[in-house]
């Protein structure tokens, strides 16, 4: 069907845009690196909820997974796949928004990056919901479809928190600085509730692992860098452990033949 070929082509184009935008937005062609954009608001020192620098290495794994997905979905057997018909367009949108965030951070304003990443998070949540309506038939599908998009969703969850907090840090009155740790712990409590609920409902491990990865490096950042906050670090570690436990518990509740990443 022409529509199926169009879907596959749009996904390829979206992945290409994402990779080009990632290169441009990260400063690979001579521009400013992400950590230096927006007056340093997006750096590891930008707020109490910013992960330490090594956390962002997860993007390499996410991009690799999305590239593998793009190649896999373009193969003839996937052309008329009903699962891909349902979710392919949404994954394409998520890749476009992924690239658009980097372009926005590089050339536009911090509030607009919050808008773009919120749209990206909502789109990825939609992807996870659609994937939950039917199960992957093979392990390659579990890895490149469920796994890659699950990692993307989990990481963007914590990235949205960091991005939004960076913006609030810039616009908040100076008097609020004394309550920064309290607000940080409160936000982490919200992440805990939403993350556990998501893990138990979706019964997936990849989102929990990616979010926990970010939280772990958030803790490292607060213990070894600025702004220093032992309280925030401890809270982040607790949330990370509970999220992984909830993810494992969710997966174990699935039938063996219905394991999802």
What is each of the regions a protein language model found here?
Residues 206-218:
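Central hydrophobic cores of alpha-helical transmembrane segments
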């Amino acid at each position: 069907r022409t529509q199926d070929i169009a879907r596959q082509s749009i996904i390829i184009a979206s992945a290409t845009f994402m990779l080009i935008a990632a290169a441009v937005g990260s400063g690979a062609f001579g521009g400013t690196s992400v950590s230096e954009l927006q007056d340093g608001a997006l750096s590891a020192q930008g707020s109490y909820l910013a992960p330490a620098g090594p956390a962002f290495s997860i993007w390499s794994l996410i991009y690799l997974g999305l590239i593998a997905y793009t190649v896999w979905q373009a193969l003839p057997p996937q052309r008329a796949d009903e699962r891909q018909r349902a979710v392919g367009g949404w994954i394409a949108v998520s890749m476009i928004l992924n690239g658009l965030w980097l372009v926005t951070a590089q050339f536009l304003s911090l509030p607009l990056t919050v808008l773009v990443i919120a749209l990206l998070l909502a789109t990825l949540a939609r992807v996870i919901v659609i994937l939950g309506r039917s199960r992957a038939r093979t392990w390659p599908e579990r890895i490149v479809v469920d796994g890659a998009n699950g990692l993307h969703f989990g990481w963007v969850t914590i990235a949205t928190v960091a991005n939004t907090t960076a913006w609030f840090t810039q616009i908040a009155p100076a008097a609020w600085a004394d309550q920064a740790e309290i607000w940080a712990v409160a936000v982490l409590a919200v992440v805990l509730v939403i993350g556990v609920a998501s893990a138990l409902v979706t019964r997936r491990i990849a989102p929990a692992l990616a979010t926990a990865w970010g939280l772990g490096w958030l803790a490292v950042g607060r213990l070894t860098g600025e702004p220093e906050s032992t309280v925030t670090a401890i809270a982040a570690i607790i949330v990370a452990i509970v999220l992984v436990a909830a993810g494992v518990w969710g997966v174990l509740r699935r039938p063996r033949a219905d394991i999802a990443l």
